[in-house]
A protein has these predicted regions:
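Hydrophobic, lipid-facing positions within transmembrane beta-strands of outer-membrane proteins
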Residues: 14-18, 51, 61-65, 112, ...
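Gram-negative outer-membrane beta-barrel transporters
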Residues: 84-86, 108-211, 281-285
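C-terminal beta-signal and adjacent terminal beta-strands/loops
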Residues: 93, 203-210, 229-286
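Signature of Gram-negative outer-membrane beta-barrel scaffolds
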Residues: 1-24, 153-154
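C-terminal beta-barrel architecture of Gram-negative outer-membrane proteins
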Residues: 39, 48, 175-230, 241-245, ...
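Residues on the lipid-exposed face of transmembrane beta-strands in outer-membrane beta-barrel proteins
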Residues: 18-22, 65-69, 126-130, 140, ...
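Transmembrane beta-strands of outer-membrane beta-barrel proteins
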Residues: 16, 29-31, 63, 76-80, ...
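Membrane-embedded beta-barrel scaffold of Gram-negative outer-membrane proteins
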Residues: 23-36, 56-124, 129-131, 137, ...
Length: 286
């Protein structure tokens, strides 16, 4: 039997931006409020339950205060902003884990979209470039972020119970892909004619990969170095990335089993970032 579901395809959506700017001899101060949206839609896979076939339009209000200025006789460029974001009907990526044959894994994924009632975020972003002298330039950036779901009952979370229809309550839990801090520091030193030495340090807090499970990235720190030689047309370099050979999780899954040796028990699976990497490069400008 064929079941046809009808949905109203007419919907009014609106967005906009209002900003106030104050310019001084030293820079620009601003305040803004903006509203954006992400259109809703339909989950077309027939495996998705009828009551979750449609997902609603998401909207977001963003409020921001910031400054862009120059300091120390224009040798420092500074940009900083604080923000608050209120999101309603947050679209979240979900997935059904369905056995391919019988009632046990191996399994397949059916991806679909659903809505959390709301989410709240606030944070700070800062960037700085400092021309220390004719031979040395430094840079730094900082990002601080706090996020949380509001009133989100997740029926596809690994800790939900599909047999009884009991969801996993994610109210107050952090959003995925939202580390609480990100830091970058670096410098470029021209120590001889046409020769440069640069280094960069970056750090990121731990964060969840998905709203379906508790698997996430570990907090990590990375160090990169580069020695370069430049002519009017050629640019040569030797470099090392991830100098300390840190282990970085870039992606992960934690809601299914994939190994028949342990009876397809549910366990995490990870993809990792590049290990310590040495290399050389050459570029020619035509």
């Amino acid at each position: 039997n064929r079941v046809v579901a009808a949905f109203d395809t007419d919907e009014g959506m609106w967005g906009g931006r209002l900003a106030l700017e104050y310019r001084t001899a030293g820079g620009l101060w601003y305040a803004l409020a903006s509203r954006g949206y992400k259109a809703g839609g339909v989950n077309s896979d027939s495996a998705v339950p009828d009551d979750q076939r449609r997902f609603d339009t998401e909207s977001m209000w963003n409020y921001e205060l910031g400054v862009k200025t120059r300091l120390l006789d224009d040798r420092i460029d500074l940009r900083a902003a604080v923000f608050v974001q209120d999101r309603d009907d947050v679209q979240t990526d979900q997935a059904l884990v369905l056995p391919i044959v019988g009632d046990a894994c191996p399994c397949e994924f059916v991806d679909y979209q659903t809505n959390a009632a709301a989410a709240r975020s606030y944070g700070l972003e800062m960037e700085m470039n400092w021309r220390v002298n004719r031979s040395l330039e430094a840079f730094a950036s900082l990002g601080l972020l706090e996020t949380e779901f509001v009133d989100f009952l997740n029926f596809s979370h690994v800790e939900a119970d599909p047999d009884t229809g009991t969801p996993f309550d994610m109210d107050g839990r952090e959003l995925p892909q939202a580390p609480s801090y990100q830091v970058a520091l670096g410098a470029v030193w021209e120590f001889a004619r046409r020769w440069t030495l640069s280094g960069e340090f970056e750090a990121k807090d731990d964060f969840l990969f998905s709203s379906r499970h508790q698997v996430g990235s570990n907090a990590y720190e990375l160090v990169h170095l580069r020695l370069g030689y430049r002519t009017p047309r050629w640019d040569f370099a030797v470099f090392v990335r991830n100098l300390t050979d840190a282990t970085i999780r870039t992606r992960g899954f934690g809601s299914f089993g994939n190994d028949p040796r342990d009876g397809y028990a549910v366990e995490p699976y990870y993809q990792f970032g590049a290990p310590r990497t040495f290399g050389v490069s050459a570029a020619y400008a035509f």
